[in-house]
Amino acid sequence: SFSPCHMSRDLRVALFKQRHPPPLHHEDKEYEDEHDELGDLPSFGAGSTSPARAPASFTPLSSDDCFATALEIDILCTPNTHATIRAYYTPPRGESNTVVVCHHGAGFGALSYALMARDVSALSQGELGILAYDCRGHGRSTFPSHIVKDMSLASLTSDMIAVLQTLFPASDARPSIILLGHSMGGAVAVETAHALERQNDIRVTGVVMIDIVEETSLELLPSMSRIVRQRPEGFVSVASAIQWHVKTRTI
């Protein structure tokens, strides 16, 4: 099976080198539910109003060519309770059988990985599959009302394991997994890696954490109510929502 250790140096550099993605092509057809261009908006703002740089356009980009398919995965979130996970997946091609599984940060969604997914697939020439999903309380995943507010690390980890075991049932064809998490998702990725190691179930070949800032997050907790109150109640368009989030440096 494919291992990151076997990739050429040039490919490793290309995968992790910072670069500006090219503009996406806009498609006329709808992609699943109303394009799924952005998922849910982030749940907090940073409060600053001066942008680092003004982009030429705030027009939303299409995610049409970023993943091969959109999925709805039915999981057991408790022994007697089902939930539906919205996921986006591009399977690995050829002899490779490794999938990068992405968990987003708090207030974000699976499609925050859309451009990265497209580029990783292209740069690895399809050797790496990529899966991203909306965790509970985010995006288009649906959980029962008495379950969805439980955002504990244990519950998020249990959800991630359930997604993996459901989508990749035990067999010789089960892929090896690279777990990738941004912010809150980084903690989930690490905890999931430990849990899978104890279970000796799914093979994890790597863990990637992006922007892990627990100390800063804890320091901001007393100010979070003020930050949330500064958010607009709504936006007249997706473009205006993007503009506000960029100018306040939320994204």
Whereabouts are the PLM-identified features?
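Structural motif
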Residues: 98-99, 176-178, 206
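Gly/Ala-rich beta-loop-alpha elbow adjacent to hydrolase catalytic centers
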Residues: 181-185, 189
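An N-terminal hydrophobic leader/cap segment in hydrolases
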Residues: 2-75, 88
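Flexible "cap/lid" loop of the alpha/beta hydrolase fold
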Residues: 190-194, 198-239
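Conserved HGGG/HGGXW glycine-rich cap/lid loop of the alpha/beta-hydrolase fold
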Residues: 83-143
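Core-facing hydrophobic residues within beta-strands of well-ordered domains
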Residues: 127, 174, 202-204
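Alpha/beta-hydrolase
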Residues: 10, 228, 239-251
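Active-site loop/oxyanion-hole signature of alpha/beta-hydrolase fold enzymes
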Residues: 63-67, 73-81, 91-94, 132-180, ...
